[in-house]
């Protein structure tokens, strides 16, 4: 559907942003046995849940809920990131807004890449510069925490696809959404 919309964080998708639309479509059309999708739960957003259930019908066993790290799980998730994840013996990288203070997550989490705060123009005007940037981020057996709004889906798809081509199948790329915003930005952006 080619219409202008603005999301909860103020990112506006214009009708002429065909690069964004194509890259988002590629990310949802991608299929691999180890590639999972997170969708809204029925109680949070019934129309979107139904849309994604239909869209992902062929890989429904690879679908989970995108609110896995929020609501009643948010405190557990934040505690895991801030303390327990230090013991994983894996590199953990953060990809997110240039305004996020990722150092508050702990010195065991490294910065992989920043995204302009409203990165839609970046992807609209310079999609290949963005793709070149992500293609240099391949550490074996690493965990990538991605909090880049709607660009997270595109970044994760690209990292996973290129990682597989490099036989780097053991890395995990996780869209953490806004689940750590109160730490990264010192403010609550959602009511979990």
Annotate each language-model stretch with its function:
Residues 42-45, 97-101, 145-155, 180:
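Gly/Ser/Thr-rich loops at beta-strand to alpha-helix junctions
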Residues 118-122, 166-192:
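Short, flexible loop segments at boundaries between secondary-structure elements
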Residues 19-23, 123-137, 151-153:
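A short, acidic, amphipathic alpha-helical segment used as a generic capping/interface helix at domain edges
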Residues 48-50, 103-105, 152-160, 184-187:
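A short acidic (Asp/Glu
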Residues 1-105:
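Electropositive, gly/pro-rich neighborhoods at or near active sites that engage anionic ligands
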Residues 41, 112-115, 177:
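Residues at the C-termini of beta-strands that transition into short coil/loop
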Residues 91, 142-143:
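Structural motif
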